[in-house]
Amino acid sequence: MFLAPDNAVKQLFRSLSPSWMAKLSLSYERTPIGTVLKKSLHEGPLRVQKALYPEGDDICHTVIIHPPAGIAGGDTLDIQVAVGKGSHVVLSTPSATKWYKSFKNPATQNVQFELGENAKLDWLPQENLFFKGANSNLITKLNLPASASFIGWDALMLGRHASGEEWSSGHIHLLNEIRRDGQLIWIENGHIDAEDPYSKSLPQLGSWPVCATLLALGPQCSNHLAENLSEMMPWTNSIRAGVTLMPQGIVIVRAVSIDIEMARNFMIDVWSKLRPIIHGVPAQPLRLWAS
């Protein structure tokens, strides 16, 4: 498939460049003046902008800056976030994370969240965009006590359909683990293989190029909440979604779509519905969503 010159050169440059390891460690605490970013340590091209407070001092917003050229084979992103007792943190990214073709080793993103008592976390990254030939590992691990609450999502876009590039080759490994007080309560280990017919079957993705998952945990998660959410689940030729409450008290919303913007807007709507219930604060759209 022919690529526009700029994109072709950029992808080739990143794919052939030496791989790198980037680390980011963030620690938040609740103080008398609100939630503060107490520690920010980084190695390599992965860092954060300054702490922002568009909702007031109680809620700390932080934007994680990914490498601007994207992620190629052999690269590793390691992100560790500790949200202290009583803190409320909103984490986001400014743009899509691009996963380029891997010629040898896979690229890996490893994200770990540790929440304290009564802590609250919104994990709202932009989508992951997988180029043809991408070989990627996405690992997310969460540990929280029963009193804490979490809302987070991940969206995957397979191929660059606007440029006419189908995701005809590549592999994605997804691993999600959730622990409550250190005890494993949920594990999801999935594989998406572009050349596997099952990956394009109805039980998996049904040939939809976009898929998204939202997870919510907290004392307010209930059957009643899941039933209310079910009323806003679309089922059209452009986007389809469903909601489930797991016995462990995890609300899971999954969606597939033909368009990433449509999926993103749907997830924002679900988050806006959940946030006042799960976190006890109004939903305020992030400014970067409008850019």
Curated annotation (Swiss-Prot):
One of its GO terms (molecular function) is nickel cation binding. It holds the Pfam family UreD. InterPro entries: UreD. Keywords: Chaperone, Cytoplasm, Nickel insertion. It is found in: Cytoplasm. The keyword Chaperone applies. One of its GO terms (cellular component) is cytoplasm. Required for maturation of urease via the functional incorporation of the urease nickel metallocenter. Belongs to the UreD family. PANTHER family: UREASE ACCESSORY PROTEIN D (PTHR33643:SF1). UreD, UreF and UreG form a complex that acts as a GTP-hydrolysis-dependent molecular chaperone, activating the urease apoprotein by helping to assemble the nickel containing metallocenter of UreC. The UreE protein probably delivers the nickel. This is Urease accessory protein UreD. It comes from Polynucleobacter asymbioticus (strain DSM 18221 / CIP 109841 / QLW-P1DMWA-1) (Polynucleobacter necessarius subsp. asymbioticus).
